[in-house]
Amino acid sequence: MAAQRLCASIGCMSVHYESVPLGTLYPEAFGIPAPLEALERHIWPRKPAVFIRLAPAAEPVVPEPDLLADPGLPAVPTGAAVKGVRQLQLGQFGLVPPWVKSASDAKLRSTKLVNARSETVTTTTSFRDSWLKGQRCIVPMMAFFEDDWRSGKAVPTRISRVDGKPMGVAGLWEHWAKDGQEIISFTLLTVNANSHALLHRYQQGGNEKRMPAILGEGTYDAWLNARYEKAKEFMRAYPANWLTANPVEGKRLSQLDRSIA
């Protein structure tokens, strides 16, 4: 099946998530208007989706020290930053580095660049430039999907917030242009989940467990505005008691699997 082949090729971390539906959730959760057109509900590599980035201004600003609204998460790092406002951008899920030589090469590479390890993002060739240029973003989603292998078979599981609200996942974006073609793309940043009370149960045994770097709601502006040398301080595992996991029904799974291009 297509999903299994994809997972085998890239390690099957966070390759599939559920987009935020149109309506009031975008302004309520992210302080921006909703997209003008509905997105596909299930987002896979190379599918179009939206992310939130910074529309920069010129003057420097120091973020407020009390931006962390969620209790239980460590304090937000502060420091001089570039002032800007949030901007919703349509892009491809799966980052295309600026040095890619052709659109065909971009298609092949982006499928494997849907996740960026936070520990090595500053040194990995595919993501380093985006990180150093401060091209950070927030990826809105209702849930992400991971396989539960505890029964010996892969059971896709939907992982969402306990309160049902959207999540904002830390990401990077990039703009690729060559020979009259342009691709705006993004990737999800991930953190280690070996010791996470919930996420350590998922993905295949014997491999390092990973999870998306979910941001606290009060940290969105600080994440987008922080200097790159401070940005890694936002890479933390989201509290397990704020998340819930529910298996996906088999009939629905077959429909999801066919959605991979």
Description of each model-found segment:
Residues 2-8, 12, 24, 67, ...:
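C-terminal accessory segment of soluble enzyme catalytic cores
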Residues 136, 148-168:
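Catalytic cores of histone-lysine modification enzymes
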Residues 42-46, 86, 132, 152, ...:
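Short, surface-exposed loop/turn motifs at beta-strand boundaries within globular domains
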Residues 91, 98, 160-192:
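A motif-centric signal for short, conserved binding hotspots located
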